[in-house]
């Protein structure tokens, strides 16, 4: 919305907001005036233009403070001054900015609550306001859409007692329809954007934006308090209240969808108890409790039924315990972990947990604390950056994580929102034809200080239609499992009917295309790899990983009849006579990457360094030992204010021992030597150099696909070495083409490359390097 703050003669402030939304701020400048902006403009029509008018009737019924909006056409008025072109003769909403009087914004209110435990807010009023958001599907309730009125500001009581006031009802009654927006975008891309539908399909995301006070002690409502508030809220929303709310809309809106809105409100009201029960269970699975910067006493004790009671009290300046700040019992069947953040006060924590299995983490601060551990069923994980704290009782039940870095005690809210995402891959090349892959990725977020996730697992299955080959790929990543090291597990099955070119070992291997055709050199075999690793990230630009791996090989001779791979005299590999025998290997692999590029897409400066080591130890009589070391260094630099970008990559590797035919180093194709078939040359050593020049021609202000258009030239050179099958010739490919980077996000390029073996076209998304 375009907003303007107004002041009337009494000094009271009003907010004037356009009903029609402006989408320029939502997209990059290069997308302004394109179909993307038109799509967003059309999407804003999903918002009901008059939804704010419905709120007062509902809010009055459930005791939620509210503004008193009116909607009309802004008349011509000189008082608008320079803003007149934005507002005159437009439909706009006008409402008081602070309905109850002077109030604080959310950052100030949250800061006051953190600084002083004498300042508080009304958690049940906050719960009612959030339930009203759910009723009308107002999902965008971030911090800036709340005001906080101090109920004590006109009294002699200096302590603040905040009443939450929701405002800006832009997203209420939003309708999401269609396969892309409802079934794809809302489900997987942005599930927070909930629509005004019958029932409440995803309460966890309906309340996502307003979760910023979940960790406050006052917000730790018991289940009894929670359900009572929900029950009272629903009982007050009678059909007559809902009908009155609908009839607050203009007559044209009532005639168009009044009955539908009424029935949807009924459905959502009736679904609230079950939805809020689900949300209560959701937020109480792993609980944050964030105490203030003043002095507090925390008493944690188990109950007879293995629950865990947490009581927090204020400690005054004289060191005496005064008022209670929270007192809640967490059931072990529901709550798995409590994370207690102590902040800056001179706090004391007394633990008397004889039976509860609930995991307890305590995060201290630079201020010394006092810990009294009478008993604890399990180890207490304590994080501190001071060594001055006092430990009494069974201190051995504490597992201390000490670090002077302030990050060790920083408040990091738990992320409860695990996600899964469907995956789709597609591609085309001359050997495999069109390929298609489907899969899914699951991301688990709930770990303590695990970023960017706790663990992630993904599985894809792809097939190449020309060859009938399949590829099944699994990858799992667990963050900071062994100290600072991540665990990564990669499993790849190129089966059944994996296809790979093989022309024999040597720099002078023949490709008799006219005599045999390309299919003759395609080998069908199955490969299975399992590779667990430990990965370290010592800096933002450096990654290092190492771990064991296992590999299995199988080739069916009936699927390779009349093909090159069954011609042992031409293969020149140690396994030429055992190609059809199953093989198994185990070994160690390691990789290192260092990335100092200034950006990921078409970088103009920086280096990208990668290196990999793979060892293979044979596990049966047909499997021999070998090891492979490979790497590459890519440099980027530019001229004429990035009008020309040069990218140069030099790479190579060596193999020692007795590799199988597919374990050699390969040169050829899109990856490192254009102008030749994939896997064209196999050798024990390899070196190559790729250089590309990308010349920017024009920034295209296209309506449909804006982006950067340019020409590119490339030159590839390389060779392999193989004992007994070598020559001094370097293979070369030279070519050029065009590129187009769509919206600075998706590079596309088409090049034609010539070598001694002919012309080869290449089209792909993304640059090679």
Regions found by a protein language model. Name each.
Residues 445-450, 482-487, 540-544, 554, ...:
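Repeated loop/turn-to-beta-strand initiation elements of outer-membrane beta-barrel proteins
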Residues 428-432, 442-444, 461-467, 480, ...:
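Transmembrane beta-strands of outer-membrane beta-barrel pores
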Residues 177, 351-352, 363-482, 577-604, ...:
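Outer-membrane beta-barrel initiation region
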Residues 589-590, 738, 758-769:
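Outer-membrane beta-barrel "beta-signal"
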Residues 1-110, 137-138, 160-207, 329-330:
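Conserved ATP-binding subdomain of kinase catalytic cores across diverse folds
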Residues 44-45, 150-327, 332-339, 345, ...:
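C-terminal catalytic region of ATP-dependent kinase domains
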Residues 415-416, 473, 502-504, 513-521, ...:
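C-terminal outer-membrane beta-barrel translocator/porin domains of Gram-negative envelope proteins
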Residues 424, 438, 457-461, 487-491, ...:
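Membrane-embedded beta-strand positions of outer-membrane beta-barrel proteins
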């Amino acid at each position: 919305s375009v907003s303007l703050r107004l002041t009337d003669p009494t000094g009271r402030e009003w907010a004037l907001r356009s009903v029609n939304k402006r989408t320029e701020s939502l997209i990059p400048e290069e997308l302004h005036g394109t179909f993307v902006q038109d799509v967003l403009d059309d999407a804003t029509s999903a918002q009901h233009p008059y939804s704010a008018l419905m709120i007062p009737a509902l809010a009055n019924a459930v005791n939620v403070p509210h503004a008193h909006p009116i909607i009309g056409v802004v008349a011509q008025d000189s008082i608008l001054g320079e803003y007149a072109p934005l507002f005159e003769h437009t439909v706009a909403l006008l409402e008081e900015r602070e309905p109850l009087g002077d109030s604080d914004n959310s950052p100030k209110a949250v800061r006051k609550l953190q600084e002083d435990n004498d300042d508080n807010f009304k958690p049940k009023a906050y719960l009612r306001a959030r339930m009203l958001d759910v009723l009308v599907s107002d999902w965008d309730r971030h911090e800036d859409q709340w005001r906080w009125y101090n109920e004590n500001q006109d009294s002699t009581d200096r302590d603040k007692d905040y009443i939450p006031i929701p405002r800006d009802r832009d997203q209420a009654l939003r309708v999401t329809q269609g396969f892309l927006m409802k079934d794809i975008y809302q489900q997987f891309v942005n599930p927070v954007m909930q629509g005004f539908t019958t029932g409440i399909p995803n309460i966890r995301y309906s309340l996502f934006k307003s979760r910023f006070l979940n960790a406050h002690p006052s917000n730790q409502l018991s289940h009894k308090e929670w359900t009572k508030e929900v029950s009272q809220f629903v009982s007050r929303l009678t059909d007559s209240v809902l009908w009155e709310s609908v009839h607050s809309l203009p007559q044209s809106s009532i005639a168009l969808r009044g009955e539908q809105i009424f029935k949807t409100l009924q459905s959502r009201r009736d679904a609230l108890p079950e939805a809020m029960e689900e949300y209560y269970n959701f937020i109480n699975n792993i609980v944050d409790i964030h105490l203030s910067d003043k002095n507090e006493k925390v008493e944690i004790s188990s109950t007879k039924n293995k629950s865990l009671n947490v009581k927090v009290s204020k400690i005054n300046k004289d060191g005496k315990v005064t008022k209670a700040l929270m007192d809640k019992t967490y059931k072990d069947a529901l709550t798995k972990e409590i994370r207690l953040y102590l902040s800056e006060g001179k706090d004391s924590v007394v633990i008397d947990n004889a039976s509860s299995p609930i995991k307890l983490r305590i995060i201290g601060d630079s201020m010394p604390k006092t810990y009294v551990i009478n008993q604890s069923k399990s180890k207490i994980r304590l994080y501190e950056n001071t060594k001055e704290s006092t430990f009494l009782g069974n201190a051995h039940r504490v597992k201390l994580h000490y670090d002077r870095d302030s990050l060790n005690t920083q408040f990091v809210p738990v992320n409860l929102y695990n996600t899964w995402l469907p995956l789709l891959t597609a591609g085309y090349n001359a050997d495999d034809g069109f390929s298609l892959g489907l899969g899914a990725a699951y991301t688990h977020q709930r770990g303590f200080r695990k970023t960017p996730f706790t663990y992630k697992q993904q599985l894809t299955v792809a097939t190449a239609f020309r060859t009938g080959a399949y590829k099944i790929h699994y990858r799992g990543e667990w963050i900071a499992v062994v100290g600072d090291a991540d665990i990564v597990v990669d499993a790849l099955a190129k089966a059944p009917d994996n296809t790979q070119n093989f022309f024999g070992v040597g720099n002078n291997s023949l490709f008799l295309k006219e005599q045999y055709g390309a299919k003759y050199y395609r080998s069908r075999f199955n490969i299975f790899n399992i590779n667990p690793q430990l990965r370290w990230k010592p800096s933002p630009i450096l990654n290092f990983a190492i771990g064991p791996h296992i590999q299995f090989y199988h080739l069916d001779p009936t699927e390779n009849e009349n093909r090159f791979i069954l011609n042992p005299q031409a293969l020149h590999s140690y396994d030429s006579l055992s190609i059809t025998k199953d093989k198994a290997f185990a070994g160690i692999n390691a990789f290192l990457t260092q990335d100092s590029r200034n950006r990921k897409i078409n970088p103009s400066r920086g280096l990208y360094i990668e290196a990999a080591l793979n060892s293979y130890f044979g596990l049966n009589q047909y499997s021999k030992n070998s090891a492979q070391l490979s790497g590459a260094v890519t440099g980027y630099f530019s001229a004429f204010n990035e009008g020309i970008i040069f990218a140069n990559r030099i790479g190579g590797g060596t193999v020692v021992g007795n590799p199988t035919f597919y374990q050699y180093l390969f040169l050829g194709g899109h990856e490192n030597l254009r102008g030749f078939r994939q896997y064209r040359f196999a050798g024990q050593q390899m070196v190559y150099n790729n250089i590309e020049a990308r010349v920017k021609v024009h920034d295209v202000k296209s309506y449909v696909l804006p982006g950067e258009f340019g020409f590119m030239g490339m030159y590839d050179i390389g060779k392999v070495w193989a004992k007994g099958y070598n020559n001094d010739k370097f293979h070369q490919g030279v070519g050029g083409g065009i590129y187009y980077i769509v919206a600075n996000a998706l590079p596309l390029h088409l090049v034609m490359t010539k070598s001694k073996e002919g012309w080869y076209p290449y089209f792909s998304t993304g640059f090679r390097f």
